[in-house]
């Protein structure tokens, strides 16, 4: 076993991984990313080992790294320099989500909120934000309210030309705001605006919270940290904040579409509270696209680490003798457990990139001031799809890391595998920017709203058009599994829409109110509807990408990847396919599963090269089990040797204790 | 919201939770556990907060706690004082698996191995082990071998009346041995025994590795730590060990059934290498029953924390206004996500307790020296069931903690919820004492071995008897969901056995060797077979327990619990039920899912009282979200307030940096 086995596996592939990478990610993106990586490698502050840092240490390194990135001046505005922005973002997200959260929350959450809700009077602040002269945080969540943002309880009361902020109860204390506990000088904060004794509802404000020199909090503001957190979020200073008659100037009100006149009258151009709220929170939906990428990245890490390790790891063989043991990657079961996430890493990337393209077009039209029915349809569709894709991608991502850990056996549990930490890092992606089950309701609500217009559904991204045709049941398999899968998804989505909608009617007719109805149709119906619609779109978009791909040399392997991805997803709906009547008889399911097993097996010779095409640089990957040289044992032992012959101070106490026990027993 | 809502939910229950607890756990067990808890509460060394300790700190507290427990003299031998042993074990496991590992690895793994493989010449060592004059570790795993223990490469060579230990390669370095890195004075170590130039195969040895006074390693031995690990295992000093001509006396050989004569001849009474190996590793299967309990405990923690929090957490409501918001436990979807694990916590406990009963009977017969065909059938059946139940229970356990975290929204991600840490704590239970997918193969191998004797299968625990009758397809639902579920499982298991066995034949006939055949029948077939067999037994045993229960007042609620557990498990096989032909047509699946939703809903009024009946004492639970007083927000804020106005030292640097940015922009 002198030359690592991984080289043998590299040679099995039918394609050139660099070409595949270029085809999927774009050459420029690949080049820009490697520039960022080179920059990071050359800076000692980005170097790291496998020790677990304390809360204090972790935050200090995040601070140092953040400073470096700001100094580099690389972190550009997404709209002025899209390519650089994506390259930097992706690299940082892969390197450490804590560090990237530090930058994002300031620029893309705090900054974007001020920009989108503010007016000319906030220009100076926006300037300072872009120039990193201040540090921003985003304070929406309260101890008692996260998902139900409309009911947050912090108050901002107009008084004598100023705004007075208060926290009326424990559950109104702001919390979870990243950057807040130690660094923020300014925050965007949401509160109920009271003017002349009337609650004008949910509004966004921007206020200063600390003196930028002493970092003391301003009068009437108490800020604290939330204590320990898992994974990389230990390095993020999520804070809580309590107001007691904190006075801020009137300019704190982010006054696009509403204002308070100098003589203290509230005026607004919003037609309804919900219109105002949707503008106030509009910036949040942008974030969802970024979170889809977190899911993709999780699948990327999981499959890279576990598949490379599965080549180095040999266990059992056809005949006795350690020399006859085979790499665990050879076991069909091991492949079945890992390859679907490899295919997901690639397909979600392709899907997400296309989605970002659509979204950018949408945003451009919004920024240009377009007001049209089509644009509002566009907004709805973006909302439906992002609210479906964020849960699907993040659930897959977290699941993939759990499975990868198990597939690496005991060594997967070492800190240096990084798999448990990565799982903890990604865990909250299922919750923030919209709790997954909550936003799936948004997708199904929009779809259910279309149930009446079947036959004439038209949307800008055409993700719902297939619902116009009554789909037919399964008749036979074609030679193209992806087409077969898409047909099944169309039937599934259509039928789930029909049955969920019918169930809602039935419940309404039985006297339930719309709140009860919505709650009662979720399980097995609305939830599955949202997921089926989303997965259909994902698969369909990747299929389109494949049709348009220029480099024909990588098309066959991508086809294999998509075959697996689509069969893997569909198999999870097999029971529902039977229930909705798409097929009957055992053979359909048996066939589907056989096709799935086949699709898994077909990826085996390509697996290591596919991993090479998605894996981040070793420096970013930072996993003893997943390094590209395939020398897992060497890396493991290198780390082990650092802890040779350790004698913690309590061993003395142990020696005395054993001594005492032994004397005791002789009495 | 002055009186916590939890009290209202407590009153909804139809039963007395204390009676339920006594019925399920036994009064004596409940009493003994509360004695242990009281003892722990009174000792400051067992107090803890929510900070994450460093590797060094965590190990030091484990050492201190271990000392206290040894001083109490509570940790008795399982066979001489079963009740006390179980009460202590369960309490410690719930308190911190790291601390309990410290005790277990010494007494129940190291000690048990010496006892079972050793002879009279090891009596003194056993005495010292029981008296805690030495510290033991168990060294089986090597860097290159875990699952395939037969191929471990460490050698023990007979030379001049002594045994010489060597580590021939990097992959032969012992690793993962708990207690080894700092504390162990002695270890049981497995190696290939070479006598007169011949490899006599895999043997167990017990050797001293450190001086008990200086704790220096003995000549020819290098020991180190494995660095950082996740969760409570950070507190466990899993170590690695390398031999270079380490000489030990001949008495190191654990010589039950084999020996080396004074003149250097190897003698053995074992008939085959596999017989020897199964005796050498026999002690391991005992452990599996303990690991099933880890899965149960994980479900217990997950459902306790998430269900109690779901009552305190109110979000959304039928009409606007924070005062109209309802506890998230009211949402059918939230119930659907959590109640199955509550039912699993209770049912797995009942199953595991019964299994321990059977196992104890089995061990008694072994210890009495019985040698019979029936006993060897017993051994096989215990092996099949424990190899199935350990995966089923630990997968459910880890899954439950992940779902519970998500169900607690953002606050679930705080360290003080304990959910992520508990997930990390439980994660390796899926891997150690037999990697889950590996041992499922043992279950299916045993079942497949029975395929030929259908009609006359008889085993001591009768878990396979149902296979003797050809089961019939679904005809209609009865009034008892558990009976319906069991019928479905019988059909499922029977058919999976038939089809898996047929597939194996087909592959063999096509020229594949038995290694290939075994690998190729796993996915969708052998794996599902093992799981179905195990789940059938679990449900069946709980049903039997219910039939025999004395306290009739708790029977109805336990019936609800079992209804849910069995429907929940079966629903996961719905697609396979269709494939195997148990049912056809959408209605069957729709009905099954409706029954499942109903079973979930029926548990709602009982949920909090059920949680009370399984929840460990608050001191042990140690979760701000899950405390029995239902005051989650108060506990969260109490912790938050500890971190008020923190100013880490780097904030100075940040202030200067912002200052510089601002000056720069003005130039
Ligand atoms: C690491 C991290 C960073 C964060 N950063 C920020 C930040 O910078 N700024 C900020 O303002 N916030 C931040 N948050 C907060 C985050 O946005 C919220 O936690 C998130 O929106 C989820 O809301 P919640 O916690 O209220 O969940 P909850 O709504 O309390 O969810 C709890 C459970 O109830 C269920 N549930 C709730 N309502 C319903 C319903 N109607 N039907 C069915 N089920 C329901 C949910 O599905 C979930 O299972 C952060 C959170 C985390 C974990
Ligand atoms: C926290 C912890 C504590 C431990 N404590 C101890 C201890 O005290 N003493 C000790 O000796 N050991 C200990 N161990 C080691 C543990 O026993 C092994 O890790 C465990 O047996 C799994 O073996 P492995 O790591 O070799 O997994 P591997 O066998 O390497 O498994 C890797 C992957 O390969 C797959 N695979 C392997 N063979 C096959 C096959 N034939 N077919 C299909 N798939 C296959 C597995 O399913 C898995 O997905 C500990 C481990 C941990 C994590």
Swiss-Prot record, chains A, B:
Top-level taxon in the UniProt lineage: Eukaryota
GO cellular component, one term: peroxisome
Protein's UniProt keywords contain tRNA processing: no
Enzyme active site: 433
UniProt cross-references to InterPro entries, sorted A to Z: ACO, ACOX_C_alpha1, Acyl-CoA_Oxase/DH_mid-dom_sf, Acyl-CoA_oxidase, Acyl-CoA_oxidase_C, AcylCo_DH-like_C, AcylCoA_DH/oxidase_NM_dom_sf
Catalytic activity: IC-asc-C7-CoA + O2 = IC-asc-DeltaC7-CoA + H2O2; IC-asc-C9-CoA + O2 = IC-asc-DeltaC9-CoA + H2O2; asc-C13-CoA + O2 = asc-DeltaC13-CoA + H2O2
Tissue: Expressed in intestine.
Major location (coarse): other
Positions of short motif Microbody targeting signal: 665-667
SUPFAM superfamilies in alphabetical order: Acyl-CoA dehydrogenase C-terminal domain-like, Acyl-CoA dehydrogenase NM domain-like
Enzyme Commission number: 1.3.3.-
Record-level Gene Ontology MF annotations: FAD binding; fatty acid binding; flavin adenine dinucleotide binding; pristanoyl-CoA oxidase activity
Required co-factors: FAD
Pathway linked to the protein: Lipid metabolism; peroxisomal fatty acid beta-oxidation
GO terms for biological process, alphabetical: ascaroside biosynthetic process; fatty acid beta-oxidation using acyl-CoA oxidase
Assigned keywords, A-Z: FAD, Fatty acid metabolism, Flavoprotein, Lipid metabolism, Oxidoreductase, Peroxisome
Quaternary context: Homodimer.
Role noted for this protein: Involved in the first step of peroxisomal beta-oxidation by catalyzing the desaturation of fatty acid-derived side chains of ascaroside pheromones, which regulates development and behavior. Specifically, shortens indol-3-carbonyl(IC)-ascarosides with 7-carbon (IC-asc-C7) or 9-carbon (IC-asc-C9) side chains and contributes to the shortening of ascarosides with 13-carbon (asc-C13) and 15-carbon (asc-C15) side chains.
Similarity annotation: Belongs to the acyl-CoA oxidase family.
Protein known as: Acyl-coenzyme A oxidase acox-3
Biological source species: Caenorhabditis elegans
Biological classification of the source: Eukaryota, Metazoa, Ecdysozoa, Nematoda, Chromadorea
């Amino acid at each position: 076993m002198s030359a690592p086995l991984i080289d043998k596996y590299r040679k099995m592939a039918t394609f050139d991984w660099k070409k595949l990478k270029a085809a999927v990610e774009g050459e420029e993106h690949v080049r820009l990313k490697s520039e960022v990586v080179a920059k990071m490698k050359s800076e000692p502050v980005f170097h790291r080992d496998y020790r677990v840092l304390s809360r204090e240490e972790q935050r200090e390194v995040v601070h140092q790294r953040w400073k470096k990135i700001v100094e580099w001046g690389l972190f550009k505005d997404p709209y002025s320099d899209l390519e650089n922005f994506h390259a930097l973002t992706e690299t940082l997200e892969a390197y450490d989500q804590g560090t990237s959260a530090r930058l994002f929350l300031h620029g893309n959450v705090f900054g974007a909120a001020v920009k989108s809700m503010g007016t000319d009077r906030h220009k100076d602040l926006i300037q300072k934000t872009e120039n990193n002269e201040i540090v921003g945080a985003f304070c929406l969540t309260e101890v008692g309210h996260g998902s139900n943002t409309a009911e947050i309880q912090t108050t901002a009361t107009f008084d004598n030309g100023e705004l007075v902020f208060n926290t009326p109860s424990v559950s109104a204390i702001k919390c979870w705001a990243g950057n807040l506990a130690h660094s923020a000088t300014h925050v965007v904060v949401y509160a109920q605006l009271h003017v002349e004794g009337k609650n004008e509802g949910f509004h966004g404000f921007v206020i200063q919270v600390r003196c930028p020199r002493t970092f003391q909090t301003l009068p009437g503001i108490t800020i604290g940290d939330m204590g320990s957190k898992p994974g990389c979020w230990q390095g993020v200073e999520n804070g809580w904040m309590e107001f007691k008659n904190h006075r801020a100037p009137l300019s704190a009100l982010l006054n696009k579409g509403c204002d308070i006149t100098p003589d203290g009258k509230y005026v607004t151009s919003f037609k309804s509270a919900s219109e105002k709220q949707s503008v106030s929170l509009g910036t949040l939906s942008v974030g969802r696209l970024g979170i889809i990428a977190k899911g993709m990245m999780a699948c990327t890490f999981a499959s890279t680490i576990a598949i490379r390790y599965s080549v180095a790891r040999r266990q059992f063989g056809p005949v006795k003798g350690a020399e006859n043991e085979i790499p665990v990657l050879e076991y069909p079961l091991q492949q079945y457990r890992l390859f679907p996430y490899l295919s997901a890493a690639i397909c979600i990337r392709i899907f997400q990139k296309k989605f970002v393209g659509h979204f950018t077009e949408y945003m451009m039209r919004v920024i240009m001031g377009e007001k049209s029915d089509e644009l509002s349809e566009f907004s709805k569709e973006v909302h439906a799809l992002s609210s479906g894709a964020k849960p699907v991608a993040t659930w897959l991502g977290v699941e993939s890391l759990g499975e990868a850990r198990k597939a690496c056996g005991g060594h997967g549990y070492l800190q240096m595998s990084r798999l448990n930490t990565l799982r903890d890092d990604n865990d909250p992606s299922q919750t923030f920017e919209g709790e997954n089950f909550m936003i799936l309701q948004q997708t199904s609500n929009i779809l259910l709203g279309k149930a009446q217009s079947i036959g004439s559904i038209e949307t800008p991204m055409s993700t719902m058009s297939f619902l116009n045709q009554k789909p037919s049941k399964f008749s036979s398999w074609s030679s193209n599994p992806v087409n077969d899968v898409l047909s099944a998804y169309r039937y599934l989505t259509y039928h789930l829409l029909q049955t969920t909608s019918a169930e809602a009617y039935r419940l309404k007719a039985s006297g339930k109110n719309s709140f009860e109805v919505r709650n009662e149709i979720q399980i097995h119906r609305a939830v599955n509807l949202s997921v089926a619609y989303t997965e259909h779109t994902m698969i369909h978009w990747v299929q389109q990408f494949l049709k348009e791909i220029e480099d024909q040399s990588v098309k066959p392997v991508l086809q294999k990847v998509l075959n697996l991805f689509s069969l893997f997803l569909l198999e999870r709906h097999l029971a529902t396919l039977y229930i909705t009547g798409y097929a009957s008889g055992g053979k359909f399911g048996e066939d589907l599963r056989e096709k799935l097993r086949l699709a898994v097996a077909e990826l085996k010779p390509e697996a290591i090269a596919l991993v090479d095409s998605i894996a981040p640089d070793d420096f970013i990957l930072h996993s003893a089990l997943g390094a590209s040289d395939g020398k897992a044992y060497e890396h493991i032992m290198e780390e082990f040797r650092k802890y040779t012959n350790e004698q913690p101070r309590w061993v003395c106490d142990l020696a005395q204790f054993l001594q005492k026990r032994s004397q005791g027993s002789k009495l």
